[in-house]
Regions:
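Boundary at the C-terminal end of the N-terminal hydrophobic targeting segment
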Residues: 9-13
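Active-site-proximal helix/loop segments of hydrolytic enzymes
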Residues: 14, 42-229
């Protein structure tokens, strides 16, 4: 695949960064299925597109690991990151939960999943195997602080002591987790974080992330966090 770089000739922010944006999953491996019967990859692509435009308008340079219809391996994502010279690798995802918390139903005759109990909010992951772990934490913390200022709380369900979860919480107030084995984080040689924007199996949270004004507020928070760090 060929990654692409885009910039806008606009007034620069106080510091101009190169941000490697990684839209999680692909059309062939579309990720979680939400309560609206929409796959995660759709939300990832939309969020990355809007975030990319906001970053460029703020004077940052953006590199993408893939285009919306491209297929790409996890190793290739890390390879692109390591060749990019970027200041930050930011992988964008939308969250689900373990099946014990979910029930299946249909939306317009299409299968969908929803949570039985509220599971709402963002979460941010880092890997201590990343060679710039402390820098990764600093970026993660800055983004989390800005999201919290919006009134957006983190979800802590990934710390539940059940199969498939039990992730180490580095900061429960900010929703920061350590997940060492995440390949796109541990194999990158630049600061790297994975952001779960919201929980799409929770009907209320999916409605939140599906609303453009809410996405714009979160994206603005992320861009401001780059100046904070």
């Amino acid at each position: 695949m060929v990654s692409w770089v885009a910039t806008n000739a606009v007034a620069q922010t106080s510091k101009s960064l190169t941000v490697l944006l990684d839209p999680g999953h692909t059309l062939a491996s579309p990720g979680a299925l939400g309560a609206r019967a929409i796959r995660e990859v759709t939300y990832n692509n939309i969020f990355v597109s809007e975030l990319s435009e906001k970053l460029k308008s703020a004077g940052h340079k953006v590199v993408l690991t893939r285009l919306p219809d491209e297929e790409i391996t996890l190793d290739k994502r890390a390879e692109i990151a390591n060749a990019s010279g970027a200041d930050l690798f930011l992988s964008i995802h939308h969250d689900s939960a373990q099946t014990i918390y979910l029930e299946q139903f249909t939306v317009n005759e299409n299968p969908a999943w929803r949570s039985k109990l509220p599971i709402r909010g963002y979460s941010i992951f880092v890997s201590s195997f990343n060679s710039l772990y402390e820098n990764s934490i600093a970026f993660a913390r800055a983004i989390a602080v800005r999201l919290k200022k919006l009134g957006r709380d983190p979800t802590l369900h990934h710390a539940e002591k059940i199969a498939g979860e039990n992730r180490e919480l580095l900061d429960s107030k900010l929703g920061l987790y350590r997940f060492d084995e995440l390949l796109v984080l541990r194999k990158t040689k630049i600061p790297a974080i994975l952001l779960e924007v919201g929980v799409i199996v929770d009907e209320q949270d999916e409605a939140y992330v599906a609303t453009k004004t809410n996405r714009a507020a979160m994206i603005d928070a992320i861009v401001k966090a780059l100046d904070d760090n």
